[in-house]
């Protein structure tokens, strides 16, 4: 047993996760009724979600409390990259619609009872209210906008505190980071449970009826990850971006694919940024912020599903209108939050541009939930890996200039 544990610990985390994926799929096909196996996945995601708000709060406050006047970060560049990357992804989805137009079986889709935003104004209102949420409530409800805002406020306020107080905050950040490392080391078992749960509940053939929609969604997201993002990175860095792109997809995207939550993947991304040697003054803020506003995958989902509904209803859409849709979906995607399935509930906002009733729009959302097993996983992988990619690109572009 000791030899096995020793060999297991020497194996890289990615290989251990791959083993967990294979075992989870096999168990899901052979013994789907042993649902207790899926509890491993629920506990893993629950653990990440539980510690992530505290981690963000502690690390951001600690980082800002240690900064001095004149220190530089790349936050302005990172935010511009986040917004431009999301818009580029939305525009890519529009182009894919013209190349591969698809329609939906709206009558067969089950409507969801979840409440969707009534417009872009409501999305902005929610974001503003999240900023001034009670800090304790923000931590307990994983409101990352609120957590981030209050962490920044406390961090700046503590810049004038005594060194003893700053050291206490630094210790809290270190302890929280260690707990996160322990949880991440359990990823192979957690992902085993997540894969088992997906296969045992849905089987491998449940998505056959929606194969074309899945192909367009996944194909567009793949194009963004392997073509659009590398182009942006190359323009900014002036060198081959693919080693960095593949590193982000491997170390961040794979984990995010199975957790289906950008929020739960924050600890993984923070560790990757540290491994890449990035400036903590930047990434301790940009990563949790990215889990909320950097939503390239969400923009793709919103545009593809909305334009599929438009095609189904026979509504003619010129490119100028589709361009406006890209702007709307970019803004709306910023409110998707880092929660599994969040982008689907913003589809009615985009559908409203074309006069599509809320009832029909919610049927489109129902289709989204049907294909969500794959769509949401790919969307989260793109969103989360891009958080690290653009943070690294912003810093490396500054290195090029200096």
From Swiss-Prot:
Q: Name one Pfam family in it.
A: SDF
Which controlled-vocabulary keywords does the entry list? Amino-acid transport, Cell membrane, Membrane, Symport, Transmembrane, Transmembrane helix, Transport
What is any one GO biological process for this UniProt entry? threonine transport
Quickly give the catalysed reaction.
L-serine(in) + Na(+)(in) = L-serine(out) + Na(+)(out); L-threonine(in) + Na(+)(in) = L-threonine(out) + Na(+)(out)
Which compartment or compartments is the protein found in?
Cell membrane
Stored InterPro entries: Na-dicarboxylate_symporter, Na:dicarbo_symporter_sf, Ser_Thr_transp_SstT
TM helices/strands, residue ranges: 17-37, 44-64, 79-99, 138-158, 179-199, 212-232, 295-315, 336-356
Q: Membrane topology for this entry?
A: Multi-pass membrane protein
Please give the GO cellular component terms listed in this UniProt entry. Answer: plasma membrane
What top-level branch of life does the organism fall under?
Bacteria
Q: Tell me one GO molecular function of this protein.
A: neutral L-amino acid:sodium symporter activity
What SUPFAM superfamilies does the record tag this protein with? Proton glutamate symport protein
Show the PANTHER family listed in the entry: PROTON/GLUTAMATE-ASPARTATE SYMPORTER (PTHR42865), SERINE_THREONINE TRANSPORTER SSTT (PTHR42865:SF8)
Please name the HAMAP family in this protein's record: Ser_Thr_transp_SstT
Q: What does this protein do?
A: Involved in the import of serine and threonine into the cell, with the concomitant import of sodium (symport system).
**Protein family membership:** Belongs to the dicarboxylate/amino acid:cation symporter (DAACS) (TC 2.A.23) family.
**What name is this protein filed under?**
Serine/threonine transporter SstT
Q: Give the species.
A: Streptococcus thermophilus (strain ATCC BAA-491 / LMD-9)
């Amino acid at each position: 047993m000791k030899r096995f544990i020793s060999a297991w610990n020497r194996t890289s985390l990615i290989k251990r996760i791959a083993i967990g994926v294979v075992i989870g799929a096999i168990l899901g096909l052979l013994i789907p009724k042993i649902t207790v196996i899926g509890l491993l996945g629920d506990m893993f995601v629950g653990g990440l979600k539980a510690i992530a708000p505290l981690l963000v709060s502690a690390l951001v406050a600690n980082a800002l409390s240690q900064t001095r006047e004149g220190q530089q970060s790349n936050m302005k560049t990172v935010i511009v990259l986040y917004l431009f990357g999301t818009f580029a992804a939305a525009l890519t989805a529009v182009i894919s619609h013209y190349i591969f137009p698809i329609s939906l079986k709206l009558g067969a889709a089950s409507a969801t009872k979840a409440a969707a935003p009534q417009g872009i104004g409501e999305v902005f209102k929610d974001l503003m209210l999240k900023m001034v949420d009670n800090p304790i409530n923000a931590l307990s409800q994983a409101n990352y906008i609120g957590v981030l805002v209050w962490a920044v406020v406390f961090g700046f306020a503590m810049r004038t505190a005594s060194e003893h107080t700053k050291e206490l905050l630094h210790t809290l950040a270190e302890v929280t980071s260690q707990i996160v490392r322990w949880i991440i080391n359990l990823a192979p078992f957690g992902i085993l449970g997540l894969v088992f749960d997906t296969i045992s509940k849905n089987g491998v053939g449940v998505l056959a009826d929606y194969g074309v929609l899945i192909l367009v969604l996944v194909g567009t997201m793949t194009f963004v990850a392997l073509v659009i993002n590398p182009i942006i990175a190359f323009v900014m860095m002036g060198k081959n971006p693919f080693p960095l792109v593949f590193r982000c997809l491997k170390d961040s995207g794979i984990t995010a694919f199975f957790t289906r939550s950008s929020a739960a993947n924050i600890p993984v991304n923070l560790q990757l940024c540290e491994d890449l040697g990035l400036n903590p003054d930047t990434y301790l803020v940009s990563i949790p912020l990215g889990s909320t506003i950097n939503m390239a995958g969400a923009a793709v989902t919103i545009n593809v599903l909305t334009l599929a509904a438009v095609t189904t209803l026979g509504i003619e859409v010129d490119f100028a209108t589709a361009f406006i849709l890209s702007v709307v979906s970019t803004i709306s995607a910023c409110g998707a939050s880092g929660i599994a399935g969040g982008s689907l509930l913003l589809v009615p906002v985009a559908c409203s541009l074309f006069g599509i009733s809320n009832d029909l729009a919610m049927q489109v959302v129902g289709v989204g939930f049907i294909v969500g097993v794959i769509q949401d996983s790919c969307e989260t992988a793109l969103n989360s890996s891009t958080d690290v990619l653009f943070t690294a690109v912003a810093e490396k572009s500054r290195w090029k200039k200096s």
